[in-house]
Amino acid sequence: MRPKIPILLYCADRELLSATAFALRLQPYDVTAIDDSRSAAAVMMASDLVCGILIHAKQGDLAGRLIHRLLEADLHLPLLLVDRAGDLAPVRYADMVLYGRNTSMTHILGALNVLCARKRGPRSAA
């Protein structure tokens, strides 16, 4: 049996967080699911995670600002931003962005396959 890949999942919407974490745990991922941005930042800095997923679920909520803070923290971790609300401006800090309510688990899993293959380290200036 292959070891599971440790990833972080952050979403302020607890129902969406729970459903997404459940689906990801059925795959080869060891998911740390967090609904608090401070805890997410602490886990990102302290843990040996391979990748992080940040989900913005509701338009106009404060979670969007918190996600921007997490993205700007330069955590040297490949990050996938799933902007289901569609109201975050183009974000240059995320390694990959999926926009819109129609983002499916298939899209997220495909993006994770790409990001988990990347090495941890500083992002390029490009």
Task: Please report, for each region that a protein language model flagged, where it lies by residue.
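Short, flexible coil/linker segments at domain boundaries that flank nucleotide/cofactor-interacting
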Residues: 1-4, 74
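Proline-centered loop/turn at the N-terminus of a beta-strand
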Residues: 6, 76-80
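Conserved acidic carboxylate
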Residues: 10-11
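Two-component/phosphorelay signaling modules centered on CheY-like receiver
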Residues: 14-33
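Acidic, metal-coordinating helix/loop segments flanking the phosphotransfer/catalytic sites
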Residues: 35-52
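Conserved phosphotransfer microenvironments
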Residues: 37, 54-73, 84-87
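Conserved phosphotransfer cores of two-component systems
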Residues: 45-48, 70-76
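Output/docking surface of receiver
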Residues: 80-123
